[in-house]
Amino acid sequence: MPIITLPDGSQRQFDNPVSVLEVAQSIGAGLAKATIAGRVNGERRDACDMITEDSTLEIITAKDEDGLEIIRHSCAHLLGHAIKQLFPDVKMAIGPTIDNGFYYDVDLEHSLSQEDLDALEKRMLELAKTNYDVVKRRVSWQEARDTFEKRGEPYKMAILDENIAKDDHPALYHHEEYIDMCRGPHVPNMRFCHHFKLQKVAGAYWRGDSKNKMLQRIYGTAWADKKQLNEYLTRLEEAAKRDHRKIGKALDLYHMQEEAPGMVFWHNDGWTIFRELETFVRTKLKEYDYQEVKGPFMMDRVLWEKTGHWQNYGDLMFTTQSENREYAIKPMNCPGHVQIFNQGLKSYRDLPIRMAEFGSCHRNEPSGSLHGLMRVRGFTQDDAHIFCTEDQIESEVTSCIRMVYDIYSTFGFTNIAVKLSTRPENRIGDDAMWDRAEQGLANALAHNGLQYEIQEGEGAFYGPKIEFALRDCLDREWQCGTVQLDFALPGRLNASYVAEDNDRRTPVMIHRAILGSIERFIGIITEEYAGFFPSWLAPVQAVVMNITDSQAEYVQKVTKTLSDAGLRVKSDLRNEKVGFKVREHTLRRVPYMLVCGDKEISEGKVSVRTRRGADLGTYSVEEFVEILKNQVRSRELKLLGEE
């Protein structure tokens, strides 16, 4: 006679074991119709699963985050159902959910085209609209294996052989004639799976191992209703317009080529943005009392073995040999900073020491994961390491957090998700040390008035960390900033200071990054601004142009005045109509176009237009110079005349 406790604290008693759906039916027909699954004692369960003992129960509907994830997982099975009908020889591998959707890896000799995706999507919708029931059966390990052997599914058999114990009873989900295996839960009926779209096909190795066969990965998105789907597809269209690779080419910022995969060739305008970011961060380093250093980008294998990178990170490190010595190009800056700290005796009075570097790092990322500026092999980190005592952790982390928000707000990022990752199962140090470290981070977050999500067990083995993820104008999250405590590396590299009692102590090291990879951050802000960089970042801040040849000398004079004031300015004296010039520089996202005609010359002024099409009227040259200088100096996000 199970007693079911509902979220509002009310209870319902049943004479016999009862399913999740039956409990929903006892509450009301509307809830029963909306039921996708349930959370029994905190664990997600199928709507058909029986509850045999006293339990808590939350009904999961399409309005819940879990409900949407279940819809997406069931759409992966629906894709399996459809592809088996259109391509009977296909072998099914795995089909998990991902952010905003799902994918299925399939083994198929035929190379899938966009036309194939359209046909698959059409068949999926035809199947879903029959609103068939999804039937769940728990079977023995042997029955599951026999089922997939008969159906010619070697990947499902491999999953059973390698991942599921023989005394287990895996769940098989029946979509009419199609059968798939999954932990679940899944929707009880396909009426929940009407709003989806197949997006693309990519290659993927079985089990992610390049030694295995290359499969075809079909990506899709799925949502609870048509409105959500259309809104998401609209966001994707906007994201495509903002793609930093497309804008980077149009604005001549950088390029990449096959001979240097994952490495950036910065062109003049892109490098201008890069240097402006460095200059900005340098002003903040001075403000927050950091010293700037520069370490070598390549060091002997012996050092990397001491740090543990060689053993744990070796696959991602580029190596070379010289004079019978093996070297690795640094994937990160921290070991070099410890070497600098170790030069000379340090006292507790010297701490904290805040050491920053714009470090050129390289990581041998898989070629398939490379993506424009967002995922590269060669990058520059705005990295810093703070050497301090345990007593200084909280105040130093508090300062790091203030610096993070100070810098992000300059770019207009105010919606920031904060996550605190705590001790993993495998870790160094005792519980007391971890208690102090985690509490220090939590106190620093509280001191800054920040709400945060705790990620249990997600910290590094050497210390807990805080992550900062920017949410952009398309509601995407970009994890950029980190504040990481490290109780291991300083000791491994024999870092020490003389404490107040004259004993040698090992300092705590705080790893701190704000922009993260400067390359990636440029990609992020290129998409955030859609290439309309604020005037302080714009490679060219103003273009001065004439209407006829008679204004050429005045244009050159105005251009020199702006240039002498430290502004990035160009002149356009081409024999073209002024409307043509304005359109061209508007497409180049130049903030201001200064038009000089006979009237402007006679008054000593310029006619000012913006890249958004606003005609701001005339300004004296001196007045406009001061306006633009103030915008650049204060790093304003908006142009003159913009609200």
Swiss-Prot record:
Function: Catalyzes the attachment of threonine to tRNA(Thr) in a two-step reaction: L-threonine is first activated by ATP to form Thr-AMP and then transferred to the acceptor end of tRNA(Thr). Also edits incorrectly charged L-seryl-tRNA(Thr).
CDD domains hit by this protein: TGS_ThrRS, ThrRS_anticodon, ThrRS_core
Swiss-Prot/TrEMBL keywords: Aminoacyl-tRNA synthetase, ATP-binding, Cytoplasm, Ligase, Metal-binding, Nucleotide-binding, Protein biosynthesis, RNA-binding, tRNA-binding, Zinc
Entry's EC annotation: 6.1.1.3
GO MF term list: ATP binding; metal ion binding; threonine-tRNA ligase activity; tRNA binding
GO cellular component annotations of the record: cytosol
GO annotation terms (biological process): threonyl-tRNA aminoacylation
Family: Belongs to the class-II aminoacyl-tRNA synthetase family.
UniProt keyword DNA repair, yes or no: no
Binding site for Zn(2+): 334, 385, 511
NCBIfam families for the chain: thrS (TIGR00418)
Cofactor list: Zn(2+)
Main location as per UniProt: cytoplasm
Annotated stretches, region: Catalytic: 243-534
Reactions this protein catalyses: tRNA(Thr) + L-threonine + ATP = L-threonyl-tRNA(Thr) + AMP + diphosphate + H(+)
Record localization: Cytoplasm
Subunit structure: Homodimer.
Gene3D superfamilies, alphabetized: 3.10.20.30, 3.30.54.20, Anticodon-binding domain, Bira Bifunctional Protein, Domain 2, Threonyl-trna Synthetase, Chain A, domain 2
InterPro entries given in the database record: aa-tRNA-synt_IIb, aa-tRNA-synth_II, aa-tRNA-synth_II/BPL/LPL, Anticodon-bd, Anticodon-bd_dom_sf, Beta-grasp_dom_sf, TGS, TGS-like
Keyword Glycosyltransferase appears in the UniProt entry: no
Highest taxon above the source species: Bacteria
Protein name: Threonine--tRNA ligase
Enzyme superclass (EC): ligase
